[in-house]
Amino acid sequence: MVPDSDEARLFLASCGLELYVGNGDETPAPLDIVQQMSSAYVEPVVAVPRDTPNPVEELGRQWHGVAARQRLAAEDGRFLILLAGPGTSGRGWLCVKDSVGRDLPARLLEGNGSLEFIALSMDGKRICATSEEDDEYWVVYEEVPS
């Protein structure tokens, strides 16, 4: 998905995300962040068992809570996102604003077939992601090493 394309704009709009042109000033390469998040040392800040009632809804609540506490979104609400799927790191960051403000994993699951995504602050320093593990959904928070 080309970041500034009609395809990207329409898909993101269907998920309640507004696409903006332009990324953060010092944005790390997507592949670097994907590798950091794929490390064997990554641990969740929240793990939601799949047998929890409404686990995807709970994952959304937890992700939004962590993202808010860590000030992932800029003052104007924008953040960067990498969506799950083949070629993720090659597509680049998409600069978005969440016009709904809740249930982002569920909205992406419905539109993309996956609830996994990596979100990055506009300054490129804070990561908040979701992940599907064996019998849990994870919310992962990491800071980008300087």
Feature locations, PLM:
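Structured alpha/beta or helical-core interaction and ligand-binding surfaces enriched in interleaved
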Residues: 1-136, 141-146
